[in-house]
Amino acid sequence: MRVKRGLASHRRHKKYLDAAKGFRGGRSKLYRTAREAVERSWMYAFRDRKVKKREFRKLWILRINAGARMHGLSYSKFMHGLTLAGISLNRKVLADLAVREKEDFAKLAQLAASKLN
């Protein structure tokens, strides 16, 4: 008896077409173009999960730098002062303090400045 493969290929095609839902034109309707678009989107997604970490770190450093400069310190001097003071807060928390809790950040900046001198 011959092997009929319609079910297997239909499932495989459906997997890609479901993943291409929301794409425009033939990219969501035609199997071959949908597969190419989906596989490319998976590559971009993989790459950008790494890029996202870099982007957030850059944003946090930018915010900490802005907060530190409001208190007369550069980013590097502020971070070095915190290290000398034995304060080990990560950049995400420091950036959040700089934006939302300005008084607490000012205290940290004052402490960092005192440890530098």
UniProtKB/Swiss-Prot annotation:
Q: Name one GO biological process term.
A: translation
CDD domains listed in its UniProt record:
Ribosomal_L20
- Fetch the SUPFAM superfamilies from UniProt: Ribosomal protein L20
Q: Organism's domain of life?
A: Bacteria
Q: Which InterPro entries does the entry mention?
A: Ribosomal_bL20, RIBOSOMAL_L20_CS, Ribosomal_protein_bL20_C
Key words, A-Z: Ribonucleoprotein, Ribosomal protein, RNA-binding, rRNA-binding
Assigned GO CC terms: ribonucleoprotein complex; ribosome
Q: Which GO molecular function entries does the Swiss-Prot or TrEMBL record give?
A: rRNA binding; structural constituent of ribosome
PANTHER family according to UniProt: 39S RIBOSOMAL PROTEIN L20 (PTHR10986)
Give the similarity note: Belongs to the bacterial ribosomal protein bL20 family.
Q: Describe the task this protein carries out.
A: Binds directly to 23S ribosomal RNA and is necessary for the in vitro assembly process of the 50S ribosomal subunit. It is not involved in the protein synthesizing functions of that subunit.
Q: What is this protein called?
A: Large ribosomal subunit protein bL20
Which species does the entry assign this protein to? Nitratidesulfovibrio vulgaris (strain DSM 19637 / Miyazaki F)
Q: Which gene encodes it?
A: rplT
